Amino acid sequence: MHWAAAVAIFFIVVTKFLQYTNKYHEKWISKFAPGNELSKKYLAKVKERHELKEFNNSISAQDNYAKWTKNNRKLDSLDKEINNLKDEIQSENKAFQAHLHKLRLLALTVPFFVFKIMYGKTPVYKLSSSTSTLFPTFVSGVWSQGWLYVLLHPLRTISQKWHIMEGKFGASKFDDMALQSVSLGIWVWALMNVINGVEFIVKQLFLTPKMEAPASVETQEEKALDAVDDAIILD
């Protein structure tokens, strides 16, 4: 396997792993986010409030009015603390998620994009001369040079006909040897389409819940016919 293809597969595997495990990210983030200590404090306050509420419900407000009132004031104070802690946790988790998104962008998305731009025309798969001749030159050109060939092919035709900039778009730029290969950009594009196709099939066959048939709704005409039938029977 060509080294460029191996690097591309690495980026794709990491990207797909993050995509498939997306529903677990929030749980993972909660373990490493700065708000973890706040979460412990939040849970402790919730537990304290629950115990105090149960104790207050177990005593008589008339017989222990002073204590019951004091506990009620403390419950109000705990409610405010719990709400403030909840807001702080959500704020810190959002900030942490934003940092992770930037990290993913800088460490994965941008490097993969730059890699495809720099090495997009690198041949990663060689075609035999007999195989390459089975397809039109235009198709082989797209395989070897990428989608840019769609724009360059007309320019190449014009340059050959009018002898304009032959060094840029002529035969020397797209020789027969160069057209007998598949470039990294097209190879990655084809691989991603295959993966997406398999994902779609698996999702439709195994992961999509079955929809029940809609209940039949009696139309106005059917109701009218039923009414006529009933009238005939009564007569």
UniProtKB/Swiss-Prot annotation:
Chief localization: endoplasmic reticulum
UniProt record, GO biological process: establishment of protein localization to endoplasmic reticulum membrane; mitophagy; protein insertion into ER membrane; retrograde vesicle-mediated transport, Golgi to endoplasmic reticulum; tail-anchored membrane protein insertion into ER membrane
Membrane topology: Multi-pass membrane protein
Transmembrane segments: 2-21, 105-125, 182-198
Family: Belongs to the WRB/GET1 family.
HAMAP family, alphabetized: Get1 (MF_03113)
Misc. remarks from the entry: Present with 2250 molecules/cell in log phase SD medium.
Name of this protein: Golgi to ER traffic protein 1
Organism ancestry: Eukaryota, Fungi, Dikarya, Ascomycota, Saccharomycotina
